[in-house]
């Protein structure tokens, strides 16, 4: 019997991480996959990345626009409310067998709430992880609203068990974002330098810095410290614009001050293959993106992880954690650039997550008893 699955996506990040899983499901005769699109995908400020989903020829079963222009804290809460209404309508119309979610963003929480009230089983990827920010609370809330958990690490599995999730509903599959990394043939350094107009004699830094909503009052000072430290280290910088969380507009204001700097390339959005190319060809990664924690080790790329956003996440040996001060960031960058290039073991998996997810999604029990969820103790 064919299973109908809806994946919810709200950002370039979650879609990029899940792309190989979605492709594997799309190729299957056992799965009828469609995608419900919301959030940053539908905003020109973030690259109208819904067009990537269309280009990949996935079926889109719903589009739920939200207002991301308002930079207030309340805008995130209001967006979740709008998305809850939208997901309810889409799920009620489409009647999927499973709603598939990833991570810790508000749109995933809204989708989980809608699904459980419509008696639709929820499968959650990347549950059980810690970060130490508001994202962690949302992630754990989604886990408690989910019926199955596809986790990246053993520690995440054990954390979910301690949270009261039943062990038989938890499967360690690895991080889905690693699959495409293992398959993609990256550009040579010469081609990469030509693409971005870089001096081949200078080193390259991939910079991604997202806002932490509890620290929005200091976010401009934080980002100035980050980019100034990178420039003081004589690095050429590929700077990706931040996400839509509260405070992102303040980071973009600072980024615009460097738009004419000869060593800075400001990028609104990178397609997934281009982003993988950046990971492969950079000499150091700087900022607070989860890609530095999860994906960079697969490229043996040293990472200077700044501040609290990924504070409690598991990390491989390539990550150097520093405070959000100019001196600490400068010291971290020098350490990262002076470390020998070695092969790191990535604690988040082996790049075979897509097949594991497919095998599970076509076989996990979906009987009505699975919906009657209660704590294991």
UniProtKB/Swiss-Prot annotation:
EC number: 3.2.1.184
InterPro entries referenced in this protein's UniProt entry, alphabetically: UDP-GlcNAc_Epase, UDP_GlcNAc_Epimerase_2_dom, WecB-like
Keyword Zinc: no
Pfam families named among the record's database cross-references: Epimerase_2
Top-level taxon of origin: Bacteria
UniProt function note: Involved in biosynthesis of legionaminic acid (5,7-diamino-3,5,7,9-tetradeoxy-D-glycero-D-galacto-non-2-ulosonic acid)(Leg), a sialic acid-like derivative that is incorporated into virulence-associated cell surface glycoconjugates such as lipopolysaccharide (LPS) which could be a key determinant in the ability of L.pneumophila to inhibit the fusion of phagosomes with lysosomes. LPS contains a majority alpha2,4-linked homomer of legionaminic acid. Catalyzes the conversion of UDP-N,N'-diacetylbacillosamine (Bac2Ac4Ac) into 2,4-diacetamido-2,4,6-trideoxymannose and UDP.
Family label: Belongs to the UDP-N-acetylglucosamine 2-epimerase family.
Entry protein name: UDP-N,N'-diacetylbacillosamine 2-epimerase (hydrolyzing)
Phylogenetic placement of the source organism: Bacteria, Pseudomonadati, Pseudomonadota, Gammaproteobacteria, Legionellales
